[in-house]
C-alpha cells in the first residue's frame, strides 16, 4: 500500500510542479487573463481549472497505481527469492513471469552468492551433525555399554550368586528342628534375601540390556520376556503385534519397556506383568501392566527416577506417556508414539 501512495504522490508533485511553472511563466511573459478566464469557463458545468485538477489527479492515480503495482511485483519476487534462499532452495531468475527492472536484477545478483554460501553452510552443519552422531553413537555408547556389561558380570558373579547360596542355606536350616524364636526369624530372613535377589535381577536387567541389534522392537521384547521367565518368579506374558517401527524410536521404546519391567520387579510386589504392543495406524501403543500393590501417582511421579526417565524418553520421540495406578489396584503404563502411514502399513 505504501508503494501506491508514494507513486501517486510523486506523480501529483511532478504534474503540479509543471503546472505552476507554466502558470508562473505565463504570468510574467504572457497575458494572465488567459488563466483568469479558467475560473469562469466551464466544462460539463465544472470550472475549467477545477476540471483540469480533477483530470490531473485521476491521471496521477492511474499512472501511479500502475507503477506501484509493478514495483510491488518486483518486491514480492525478491522476497520470495530471499525466503527460498533461507530455506535452502536454489534461487533462479528464469522462474519468474514478470519483467524485472535493472535495479531488481542488481539486487538479485547480490542474493545469488549469499544463497550459495547458505547452501554450503547447511551442508557443513549436516556433516558436523553426522560426524557428531557417529562419534556419540559408535564410541561413547560403546564405552557406556562395555561398562554396563562389566558391572553386570561382576554383580552376577558375586552378589547374585552369594544371595542365591544364602537363600538355599536358609531354606535347608528352616527344614531342621529348631527352637521357635529362630524358626520364626528364618522365614523373614529368607524373604529378605529373596527380595534382594529379585531386586538385583531387576538391576541386572537395567544394567545389561538385551540389544535389539538387527531385531525388530517386537522381537526384542519377546526375547526379553523369554529371558525374564527363566529368572524371576513373577509371571510375564506378552501380546506383541509385529509391524515396522522407525529405527529412530525403537531403542527408546525398548528402554522404556526395560525400565518399566525393572520398576515392576523391584516395587510392585505383584505376581503378573503383561507387555502389549499394538499398531493403531497413526500411532503405536506400548502398554506395561501389573497386578501389584500400586501407588499414588501424584506422590510418586515426580520423585521416581525411573518414571522420570521413561517420561523423558517418550518426549524425545514425540510420544505421550501416561501412568495409571491406585493403591492395591496395580499399575498401567501407556506410551503412544506417532507413526507415518508408510511406516505403519509396511510389512
From Swiss-Prot:
Bilayer-crossing regions: 13-33, 43-63
Designated gene of the protein: vraS
One Gene Ontology term, aspect cellular component: plasma membrane
Annotated Histidine kinase domain residues: 150-341
Main localization, broad class: membrane
Domain of life from the UniProt record: Bacteria
Catalyzed chemical reaction(s): ATP + protein L-histidine = ADP + protein N-phospho-L-histidine
Alphabetical keyword list: ATP-binding, Cell membrane, Kinase, Membrane, Nucleotide-binding, Phosphoprotein, Transferase, Transmembrane, Transmembrane helix, Two-component regulatory system
The protein's name in its UniProt record: Sensor protein VraS
Cell location: Cell membrane
Top-level class of the enzyme under EC nomenclature: transferase
Membrane topology, from the record: Multi-pass membrane protein
Pfam families from the UniProt entry: HATPase_c, HisKA_3
E.C. number: 2.7.13.3
UniProt xrefs under CDD domains: HATPase_UhpB-NarQ-NarX-like
SMART domains from the UniProt entry: HATPase_c (SM00387)
Its job: Member of the two-component regulatory system VraS/VraR involved in the control of the cell wall peptidoglycan biosynthesis. Probably activates VraR by phosphorylation.
Molecular function, one GO term: phosphorelay sensor kinase activity
